[in-house]
Amino acid sequence: MRKTSLLNSNISSVISKMGHTDMLAIGDCGLPIPKETERIDLALIKGVPGFIETLKAILEELQVEEVLIAKETEKVSPELFIEIKEIIKDTKITFISHEELKKELKYCKAVVRTGEQTPYANIILKSGVVF
């Protein structure tokens, strides 16, 4: 059994194959996922699992150098935005429109779908290097 906290084999597999600047998205339950992008669907019921707990678990495994967030997030869901900033600390944030974020999903290695129902609870994580 794995010693690290992330137990989902699909997420672990995607992360282990990622290289520098590859992208992985985490989305709320309403985020449209392109057909060509791998969908890792964790959504069980409304709110489960949550976006923040999923983000925290993935960040324990993935080295991230930059995040892409919809610029609408800060205004529409300010509490979520503050929590994201606290979690990612000094990681570079690039703000793009929600429409641009949805277009970027086709370039992601996968999208992890949560049960989250907070508006704009979506993020793209750009992989960094550990050396």
From Swiss-Prot:
Pathway: Carbohydrate metabolism; D-ribose degradation; D-ribose 5-phosphate from beta-D-ribopyranose: step 1/2. Gene3D superfamilies: RbsD-like domain. Its EC number is 5.4.99.62. Substrate binds at residues 28, 98, 120-122. PANTHER family: D-RIBOSE PYRANASE (PTHR37831:SF1). Belongs to the RbsD / FucU family. RbsD subfamily. NCBIfam families: PRK11797.1. This is D-ribose pyranase. It comes from Clostridium perfringens (strain 13 / Type A).
